[in-house]
Amino acid sequence: SFDAAHFLTNYEGKCKNIHGHRWRVVVTIKGELTNGMLVDFGDFKKDIKDLCDYFDHSFIVEKGSLHKKLFDLLNKQFVLRVVEFRTTAENFSKYIFEEMSKKYSVKEVCVYETPNNCARYVCE
């Protein structure tokens, strides 16, 4: 999991304002067992942790969503993480699926932005 702030562009609800979540990430992998094992869970957990740590305690910003002057001012004092997608749980689940799929055979990724609300990206 990671704690981070974001806001939604092109949205008129309360999430258009900067707010934060404790994002929880669940990655499910699939594959054939080799010697009774799918993967080394130590390596797998480290890779998920590294991905989450990149975003932890940052302000996640969709590329181009902030005026350049504001972006430059914020970037001097805070950790900004710029992503190519709108910062929804749905898009985060797809992004994490794609990143983890570079090394693992991922079946699905669930990203929770609250304890009860999650978005799931599933391999088709």
Regions found by a protein language model. Give the residues of each.
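Charge-rich, low-complexity N-terminal segments
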Residues: S1-E124
